[in-house]
């Protein structure tokens, strides 16, 4: 099933710009095995982006963090990389309840 990671990062160019970057980097994200379960901004602060991402393993998380090309694309889209917090979720969880 992979590893779920809750993420939070500051974005400075709006959600639309960030989302367009994600779609443009589809091949790179697939290369790392990344799947977005959720991505959206905080209702009272649109500069705070929250995500839930699925990675195949811890090595993929590290590869994502170390990918200089992808990091540069994220910066260009307004992501403040140094503000990022990524929290791996334990194996005890459920999703899409009650579906």
Model-derived features: positions:
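Short S/T/G/P-rich N-terminal loop/turn motif that feeds into the first structured element of a domain
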Residues: 1-71, 82-99
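Short arginine-rich
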Residues: 71-77
């Amino acid at each position: 099933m992979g590893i779920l990671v809750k993420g939070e990062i500051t974005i400075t160019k709006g959600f639309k710009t960030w989302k367009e970057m994600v779609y443009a980097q589809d091949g790179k994200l697939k290369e790392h095995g990344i799947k977005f379960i959720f991505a959206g901004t905080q209702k009272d602060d649109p500069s705070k982006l929250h995500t839930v991402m699925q990675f195949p393993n811890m090595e993929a998380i590290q590869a994502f963090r170390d990918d200089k090309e992808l990091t540069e694309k994220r910066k260009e889209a307004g992501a403040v990389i140094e503000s990022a917090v990524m929290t791996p979720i334990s194996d005890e969880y459920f999703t899409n309840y009650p579906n």
